[in-house]
Amino acid sequence: MINMKFFNRVEEIKEILSILEEEPNLIYFIYGPINSGKTALINEIINNRLDKNKYVVFYIDLREIFISKYDEFEAKLRATKTFGFRLIIEVLFEEYEDDKKPIEIIRSLIKDAPSLCGIPTPKNTLEEILKKKTTKNVFKYITNILMDIKREGKQPIIIIDELQKIGDMKINGFLIYELFNYFVSLTKHKHLCHVFCLSSDSLFIERVYNEAMLKERVDYILVDDFDKETALKFIDFLSEEILNKKLSDEDKELIYSYVGGKPILIINVIGKLKHKNLKDVLNILLMDEISKLKDFLSNLDYIKPKVNIEEEIIEIRKEDIINALKLFKGKYEIEVDKIPKAVYVYLVKKNILFLYPQRGTLKPQSFLVWNAIKRVL
């Protein structure tokens, strides 16, 4: 694992810190392509940019919560409404054996940690909440804790990473809408708590963007792959950190032409240069991506892809998928209306394309995917 200082994201950090200085008013969705650095950005802010004397952060990473329980919850949610309620408990609360008041637990925990991984709740209190089996009691309990934090002179912040993992569960009238309604209450109505939701699922962001109940109640912060200028600076930064030298302009341009501004791919390339040749590293990455794309297209000869659009199941032809991908041979980003919705939904779900709902455009998930498209089609 390469350990290094955080790089750039000056504008995004400035924007988020500016939001935190004002009273809570909107739900903020921090979104962008896979591995563009969303979680790294929010961790940098939590760990190094916030005054612990002013803020109490609840950082809930659904990747950790659902890694072993997602399938189990999915099945139980389909079977009974009760487990929808239990899922919210599972997501938002952190159980403690201690019988101290939650605010006392919070005081002791934030001395040693920059953030908390859930709403700290004594075991006996949690058992009482579970007996009542209503989200109303859950949200009332959380609100009371947040108000206690405000009375202590601190500003609470709730951050949920990979929120779409709940959004995928289209059960009981969309469980996630109960959370949205509550977050609107915390921000727009009570001005009590800042709420940030992180997601790399652009279809989920599109659903949020088009949701009438959230109009004028949410805003968006895009954490995209680096542009070329920033990517080249990042390559300089990494090569000095990892290789103790600068790369030539020719080598930097070559790296960018293969992987673009995807931070994780640039890190991967520079890390391997300690013991491998640059062209070999880049060619292996590209060949791997080409192989994945060919395999994806080959599978379409044996399966009939389907997507759900407004409760209608739409079947997609291989020919339509190929025609859509060919549009990117000469262009990295295109207007969304150039591709039938069912086709782009399928390609986004497969992490081949990324959707920008606010721009109304699509692009490959990375330069590497783009290069594979140009060579295969």
UniProtKB/Swiss-Prot annotation:
Keywords: ATP-binding, Nucleotide-binding
GO molecular function: ATP binding; ATP hydrolysis activity
Domain of life: Archaea
Family: Belongs to the archaeal ATPase family.
Binding site for ATP: G32, P33, I34, N35, S36, G37, K38, T39
SMART domains: AAA
Organism lineage string: Archaea, Methanobacteriati, Methanobacteriota, Methanomada group, Methanococci
Name this protein carries in UniProt: Uncharacterized ATP-binding protein MJ1010
Stored InterPro entries: AAA+_ATPase, Archaeal_ATPase_domain, ATPase_dom, MJ1010-like_2nd, P-loop_NTPase, WH-like_DNA-bd_sf
PANTHER family to which the protein is assigned, alphabetical: AAA+ ATPASE DOMAIN-CONTAINING PROTEIN, YALI0E33429P
